[in-house]
């Protein structure tokens, strides 16, 4: 993506890393150099790729989405729990549903979970309550499955964990999801996403790592709890 043939402009607050071959602009509210103002100026430079540090308001979101309709690749971030709620969040910000449905191609959500320490790793059986909760959420049987956990050692400072790994949820728009967005139908959008063969929720990705012994069931439950606003006791 970052090649000499491509013109790449970023709008950030703040610019944290200097990147080669990329024109980076930092917004500054004190002099009214807002995301919207910088974006309008950036688009007049005919960029191939535009990175918006964050879509914080309706103006920024609308400019970014309209830029995507005119041949620019636009990348940005939103503060949401998962990929499903990201698309609807744009509409909640005041962007017209038809614009979101037309311009949005994909949403990638990500979280970090802790890795089980390999130096003190041991087998662990989840409680019946935890298994039922996960099975109901993910729709798959976990009976008889063994997980891993760390008992704590000097390598991990007795935490049982060492390092982190990313869990991801990629949502690529299809006709059913686009139709639900046009109707501003959150429930229909969620149902359409679940029918997409390529869609896997964050919790399922986290569970894959737990079943592979990379992370613990406790870390999976943390991810699930933030997605459902409830926990397991």
What are these language model-derived features?
Residues 1-233:
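Short, flexible helix-loop junctions that flank or precede catalytic/ligand sites
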